[in-house]
């Protein structure tokens, strides 16, 4: 008996459960409307049960998978919104959401793969439309799993690539790679299996380890919008600067990467999408607003611009040379977390030791030991001190996070100061009074020749519209200044540029 239908969506003990549409609708109605984590977990378990029912007619299994898929959409979107709003330190909640979503998308993908395989075996003309739709939806589910792995800066393993290769083979055998179908209901629901494949592969080669989770999401939505302009070929071609082994033996990569033996090569590239992305970037620069036709309404223009610039850079036929030469080194790096870690330095309660494997004038490439750095994401601030004679505690920002097949993480750090200096800052009021002093970190010892200094402050600690007074802790030097602009912001810091007006001594 189908005991998996018991619990939140079945008949209680499951002894008289029946696999039919009514049972699926009953299960969907039982999903907790305001607890999307629980709903995703229940969906994953329920679909796992569905996937064991091979003796059930495939048309019925597909109809049920479709119903559950529709119910999962709202919860999946809510969990994505919650995930992107999390602070890097919220690891328990991050892990809970991530595991729930991944379990649901994997079970849904498995359901569609199973249905597609059965449709392909039966070769029924009646079910051909469902075969094509099942293949496209299975490919979409693989893309969503890859997206969530990348959001966590994880490594996409061989299993995903083999499933993608298998789905392509099924579509090729059925002659439906280019067939335009309704993948999902809605205005933007039409597409082809080839587009779904290219959307997945382009996401994988877009170096999302250089984007924050929120900008990764923006990039994925942009990739979906531009996917009709992507191209592919069975042989090397002008606009196809990436390659994938359809046997699933390795992740997609640039064509100059080593190709596995006996590979079935699939070449692809952004092609006209690169020009289309650049056109949107130009419009953003001209108007300061996000165009309505790219599906990113309501997204901050600066996030869209950053994500699109990143995509355009990584889709180019050849990557430009680095601005700074990397030098191989072997030393350790003491690391502290966030704004508080920068201020505390050696006194921080939590410190980690990373291994530097290369260095440049701009920063470091480091290896993060196993079970360390689970709080890492692009854009976070770290305090750091290299293992060098006379080195001070400085500050850096994480610019890249990547994982390999062994789970080892590599991090790219941009150093924003080699010696971080403590200070306090307060607002200077019109009547001569002072606001409450707040602790800050000076990134510059003195103003530049043109009078500018950069300072790290906590977000929203100042309006930055009034005159400010900065006191350098080590010697009591005072700087009177106005904010010139926020250079960048992170989860727990604003990096602000100030123009100094006067310098006095206490």
Feature map (PLM): residue ranges:
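Short, mixed charged/polar active-site loops
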Residues: 391-393
């Amino acid at each position: 008996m189908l005991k998996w239908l018991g619990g939140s969506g079945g008949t209680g003990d499951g002894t008289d459960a029946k696999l039919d549409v009514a049972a699926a609708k009953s299960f969907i109605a039982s999903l907790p409307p305001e607890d999307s984590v629980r709903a995703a977990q229940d969906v994953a378990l329920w679909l796992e049960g569905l996937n064991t029912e091979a003796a059930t007619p495939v048309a019925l299994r597909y109809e049920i998978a479709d119903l559950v898929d529709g119910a999962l959409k709202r919860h999946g979107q809510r969990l994505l919104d919650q995930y992107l709003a999390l602070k890097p330190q919220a690891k328990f909640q991050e892990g809970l959401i991530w595991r729930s979503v991944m379990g649901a998308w994997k079970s849904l993908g498995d359901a569609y793969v199973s249905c597609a395989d059965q449709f392909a075996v039966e070769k029924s003309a009646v079910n051909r439309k469902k075969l094509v739709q099942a293949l496209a939806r299975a490919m979409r589910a693989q893309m969503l799993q890859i997206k969530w792995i990348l959001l966590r800066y994880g490594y996409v393993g061989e299993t995903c690539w083999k499933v993608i290769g298998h789905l392509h083979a099924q579509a090729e055998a059925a002659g439906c790679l280019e067939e335009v179908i309704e993948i999902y209901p809605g205005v933007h629901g039409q597409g082809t299996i080839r587009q779904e494949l290219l959307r997945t592969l382009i996401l994988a080669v877009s170096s999302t380890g250089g984007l924050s989770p929120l900008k990764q999401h923006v990039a994925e939505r942009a990739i979906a919008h531009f996917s009709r302009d992507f191209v592919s070929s069975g042989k090397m071609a002008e606009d196809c600067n990436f390659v994938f082994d359809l046997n699933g033996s390795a992740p997609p990569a640039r064509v100059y990467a080593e190709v596995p033996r006996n590979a079935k090569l699939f070449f692809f590239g952004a092609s006209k999408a690169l020009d289309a992305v650049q056109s949107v970037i130009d419009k953003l620069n001209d108007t300061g607003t996000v165009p309505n036709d790219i599906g990113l309404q309501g997204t901050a223009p600066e996030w869209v611009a950053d994500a699109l610039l990143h995509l355009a850079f990584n889709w180019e036929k050849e990557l430009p040379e680095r601005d700074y030469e990397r030098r191989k080194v072997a030393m350790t790096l003491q690391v502290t977390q966030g704004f508080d870690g920068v201020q505390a330095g050696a006194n921080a309660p939590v410190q980690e030791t990373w291994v530097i494997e290369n260095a440049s004038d701009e920063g470091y490439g480091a290896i993060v030991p196993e079970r360390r750095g689970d709080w890492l994401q692009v854009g976070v601030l770290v305090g750091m001190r290299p293992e060098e004679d006379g080195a001070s505690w400085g500050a850096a920002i994480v610019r890249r996070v990547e994982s390999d097949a062994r789970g080892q993480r590599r991090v790219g750090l941009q150093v924003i100061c080699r010696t971080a200096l403590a200070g306090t800052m307060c607002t200077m009021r019109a009547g001569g009074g002072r606001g409450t002093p707040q602790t800050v970190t000076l990134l510059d010892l003195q103003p530049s020749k043109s009078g500018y200094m950069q300072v790290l402050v906590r977000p929203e600690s100042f309006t930055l519209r009034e005159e400010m007074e900065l006191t350098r802790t080590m010697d009591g030097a005072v700087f009177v200044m106005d904010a010139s602009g926020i250079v960048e912001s992170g989860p727990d810091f604003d990096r602000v540029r100030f123009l100094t007006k006067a310098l006095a001594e206490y």
